[in-house]
């Protein structure tokens, strides 16, 4: 299928009353906006067409659903008060923007040299990142917001899958709720994993929907985790970092892992 035929199919699926769709021929993107809020999303067509040609139809449908749910959520008034149980931390790369596209400052705190902690209000199928404006409107302090979000993330389930490679154990958490990486902020979870580890505990948060713990007992384990983190990072919808973290007493230290060698901090 050629790009223009694909574009028309996508436009048809995203047709809604109150929305506008503009095509950027130079960038091969669609800009979908809500007429009332003037907010919207930009959809890159070439990567989407590539997925369709690989018969990854579910991925194409998910991208369209994300756009639709996102625009619908933008039209809703969001408040922190009354949503105390729906506030969660989200992990982002240190290079993630600190402002929204309409210039509002996002609330965040430093996490590691590679990562930041932002805060979000869960809206069911999506969430919205909390801005300074929203925080000030609530009358809350940042410390109270952070404590509430951290408390809530501890209440989330922790569905791990375990695998073993060359004497090293790997634990994969993937709940697909948007907060998989956020669970690294649950200190009780990190402590349990440290106590459980026979060798060196290493963690990876390659993208927002993945959290990996590894109990490393030999050089092969470091190499496998390094490759794994890089692969997950490249496949994530919202990448965080390809660098794993040495875990010591609950603290995370980013490390470079060279093939067949132990990491140097």
Swiss-Prot record:
| Lineage top rank: taxon | Bacteria
Q: Which InterPro entries match?
A: DUF1444
Q: Which family does it belong to?
A: Belongs to the UPF0354 family.
Q: What is the name of the protein in this document?
A: UPF0354 protein ABC2771
- The organism encoding this protein is Shouchella clausii (strain KSM-K16) (Alkalihalobacillus clausii)
